[in-house]
């Protein structure tokens, strides 16, 4: 063993590698992305690593490998599990031969997600065991144990770190490479009575699942990561039940105090019933400190009824704990003070509060998406139109002054929502904006639906040749894989033509006049058509010469600021200035300026 300073996601990856991982697949999404990327960096060639087209593809690939006896891991964020739930629900009934861990990173807050959904609920829904780590060291150790449980009980298991565990750092003890487990898959053994899902088999396996989970309920009551921290005062009649990062916050707040007993739940499903009952006995009240849903709270309420225990369970359901958002040491301290009758902690305030302006997220300076949105906005000026957005950097197109995203639901939804709006408002020109990675992940089926059902819509693909928002991962259109292989690019143009979209035009959005003309030419044609705005992500290319303002020509109309919202254009002493450190020389502002006062940029 040796010590390393690791991010939580890196620790999870290193733990999986140490457990004999053979295959890892996934789709990038904060806060899970670094798990797969770290695995790839520490791959000696014995692990197959793949960024899949979407989470469903990743799940099915990993399942196939697990059927062969391989140890596999699938990585995604919590909303990715919605995409992967179809194969997962059936896989729960079929089972696996090799250990299979489905890593789903939850995002309390949410910090970078559409929802605050709780994967612990999905565990109970799918009847799959779930592991909920409370810190970086535990995440490293627990992922190895998760593989062992999965393999022993022939079932996929869910592994559910949250954002603060994923992105937290700690010095932890890790195995030396010589101590890594080496797993040699047996290979696929044909057995249609096991691997082919039919109603009769599902019925039989459902019974086996229930029996297995009853067994695991007992096993997890003795699992070392589920534990009771005894009260400092044996006569204390109050207790705390918690989990995950909230357990770490709780122990930090209680440090040095006369603390009540604490129940730590590391496996929310199957719930460690016997351990929980042992904890509840003799207590008058228990406060449940949880993020997201009241999973532990509801389990304890159920157990009090089942075993006729008089303990009062408090938490989210009793409005003693906030119903939404993430916890913190401060929020936990406040909740504990109210529950235990301690003096409320004074709010820490700096002597001189910093006067910081609000800084909402914006598209980067030089981002081609800004030009794409602006081109469509210019072309549709005065026309009745709806702009359906999607998940990615380009969701920021909803911000002023662009104001070009009217809807955003989930990945790929904009393509289909556009069709629905068009059916109700046939006189409205409907656009669906989608990124190149999202196109491959979840928009193609929607486009097939549009062609088949004769929709009237315009698909706008914002193609910057990368999965930008999550850290520039490759996708099928980039011609590169996560293993570093150079492969044939999957052409968006050819794909659209192949499914029957007859009008597909490609244009560089930074050539503004051409882009506006393209939109006017394409958008008003009947039927399904597509515009591909193709220009590389500004973060990945070398910046050109920054723009310059010729003050003798500048009339201070501020059109460049009012219409574009580029962070590279600022007001200084009442005058428009170019922020040289940010400007990439994209030239968009030069093309917007009515007096040609901006020059020096590469596209101007």
Task: Place the predicted regions along the sequence by residue.
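Conserved thiamine diphosphate
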Residues: 107-156, 162, 189-194, 200, ...
């Amino acid at each position: 063993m040796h010590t390393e300073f690791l991010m939580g996601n890196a620790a999870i990856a290193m733990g999986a590698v140490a457990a004999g991982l053979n295959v890892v697949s996934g789709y990038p999404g904060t806060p899970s992305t670094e798990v797969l990327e770290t695995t790839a960096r520490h791959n000696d060639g014995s692990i197959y690593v793949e960024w899949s087209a979407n989470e469903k593809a990743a799940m099915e690939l990993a399942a196939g490998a697990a059927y062969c006896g391989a140890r596999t891991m699938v990585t995604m964020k919590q909303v990715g599990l919605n995409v992967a739930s179809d194969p997962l629900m059936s896989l729960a009934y079929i089972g696996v031969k090799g250990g299979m861990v489905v890593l789903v990173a939850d995002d309390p807050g949410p910090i970078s997600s559409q929802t605050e959904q709780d994967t612990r609920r999905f565990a109970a829904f799918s009847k799959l065991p779930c592991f909920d780590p409370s810190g970086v060291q535990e995440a490293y150790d627990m992922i190895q144990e998760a593989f062992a449980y999965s393999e022993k009980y022939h079932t996929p298991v869910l592994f559910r770190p949250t954002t603060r565990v994923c992105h937290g750092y700690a010095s932890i003890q890790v195995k030396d490479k010589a101590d890594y487990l080496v797993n040699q898959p047996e290979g696929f053994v044909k057995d249609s009575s096991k691997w082919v899902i039919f109603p009769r088999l599902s019925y039989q396996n459902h019974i086996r699942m229930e029996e297995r989970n009853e067994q695991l309920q007992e096993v997890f009551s003795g699992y070392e990561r589920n534990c009771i921290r005894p009260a400092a005062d044996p006569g204390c009649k109050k207790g705390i039940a918690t989990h995950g990062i909230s357990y770490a916050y709780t122990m930090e707040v209680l440090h040095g105090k006369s603390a009540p007993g604490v129940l730590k739940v590391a496996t929310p499903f199957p719930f460690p019933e016997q351990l929980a009952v042992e904890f509840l006995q003799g207590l008058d009240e228990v406060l449940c400190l949880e993020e997201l849903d009241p999973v532990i709270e509801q389990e304890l309420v159920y157990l009090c009824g089942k075993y006729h225990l008089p303990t009062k369970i408090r938490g989210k359901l009793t409005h003693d704990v906030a119903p939404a958002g993430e916890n913190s040491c401060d929020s936990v301290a406040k909740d504990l003070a109210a529950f235990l009758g301690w003096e409320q902690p004074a709010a820490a305030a700096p002597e001189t509060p910093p006067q910081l302006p609000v800084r909402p997220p914006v598209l980067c300076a030089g981002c081609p998406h800004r030009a794409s949105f602006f081109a469509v906005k210019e072309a549709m000026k005065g026309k009745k139109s709806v702009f359906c957005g999607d998940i990615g950097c380009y969701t920021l197109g909803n911000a002023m002054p662009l104001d070009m995203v009217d809807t955003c639901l989930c990945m790929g939804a904009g393509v289909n929502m556009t069709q629905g709006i068009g059916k109700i408002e046939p006189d409205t020109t409907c656009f669906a904006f989608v990124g190149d990675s999202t196109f491959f992940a979840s928009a193609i089926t929607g486009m097939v639906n549009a062609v088949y059902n004769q929709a009237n819509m315009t698909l706008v693909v914002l193609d910057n040749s990368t999965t930008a928002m999550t850290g520039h991962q490759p996708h099928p259109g980039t011609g590169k894989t996560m293993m570093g292989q150079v492969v044939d690019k999957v052409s968006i143009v050819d794909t659209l033509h192949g499914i029957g979209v007859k009008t597909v035009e490609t244009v560089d959005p930074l050539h503004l006049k051409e882009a506006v003309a393209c939109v006017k030419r394409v958008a008003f044609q009947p039927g399904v058509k597509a515009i591909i705005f193709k220009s590389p992500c500004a973060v990945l290319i070398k910046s050109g010469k920054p723009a310059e303002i010729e003050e003798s020509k500048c009339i201070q109309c501020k059109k460049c600021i009012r219409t574009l919202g580029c962070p590279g254009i600022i007001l200084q002493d009442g005058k428009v200035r170019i922020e040289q450190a940010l400007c990439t020389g994209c030239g968009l502002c030069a093309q917007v300026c009515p007096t040609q006062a901006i020059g020096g940029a590469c596209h101007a």
